[in-house]
């Protein structure tokens, strides 16, 4: 390859990276997530700490869904950096393993690597950390579909114009999410039939062209549904600690309210296995399903070995 060809390829890649940096998901933009460094098939990103990201105000720990959404978007960046920027991508499945709670007040960083691309599928792994990548907060593996639809987030006109509303958590001292600012930020509410509802808003958009709900927001919603189900069915006051979550994405979340339900699959003395599903206008057509495990927190006067 001539020097001219190398220079042209390098310039084209720089332009692709800049497009990815500036034309991302709506949620990614308003959350403050930024791409710090890039290489072919690799992305390094940072999510600045914000009080609205807290999942349990009693401990100050960030909601697991915030980490899920960050890793989902960071993996998407890596996939786009492995491609030419002309094809739409969509998350097929995402597995998160939570290694330790994020330290309150510190930013979260991520390093995502797209390690293999076939004609239709991209395979990615990622690490979320705070100070050192060798001490992860969470790790992830994911599969993305290539050419998932006919949109191009990097060039097509968004469905909504104007600035989206900022991420804010309205006060609700007597509601089920009194101690979860992030759940309140998403507007999640408990319905009369004990399902949970996440109203559609511009804040939770992933693909702004369709528009479609951010896959990470769907994952956060499913995890929240499972947390509420476990607390309610076991009669515990403290939210359980997430161990792992696997989300399977079945169809795009459209510009509609989303409903979720969860159930306990197995309960041990310390660990609970759960499954959850989310749908929109037809419960028989879920947009995503999830399964995972929680660690129960000791009740006052109890100790876990």
Predicted region positions:
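Terminal targeting signals and extreme-terminal segments of soluble enzymes
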Residues: 1-305
